[in-house]
Amino acid sequence: MSPSHFAILFIIVISLVPLHGYANGQGFDANKLGSSVCHLGKCPKHREEVCYCCFNDRSRCYRSLYKCVAVCNRLVH
């Protein structure tokens, strides 16, 4: 492999590192947002399962934090 090919490959690999960090950061932001409108608890229908429920309406529970945040944000605003 010539030095110019190696340099191009190196630049491409280095440029992918911030994208990886950005993808990981999205999950953390969603958890921060979710903690303001949803709480983690046992599902009302299935006590052994864990769900995310709206703070304002505890009967609205979802297995996905993203779904809970989407629905509960509409209830708040």
UniProtKB/Swiss-Prot annotation:
Taxonomic superkingdom: Eukaryota
Disulphide connectivity of cysteines: 38-53, 43-72, 51-68, 54-61
Protein name per the record: EMBRYO SURROUNDING FACTOR 1-like protein 6
Family: Belongs to the MEG family.
Signal peptide: 1-25
Keywords carried by this UniProt record: Disulfide bond, Signal
Gene Ontology terms describing biological process: pollen-stigma interaction
The keyword Iron is annotated on this UniProt entry: no
Lineage start: Eukaryota, Viridiplantae, Streptophyta, Embryophyta, Tracheophyta
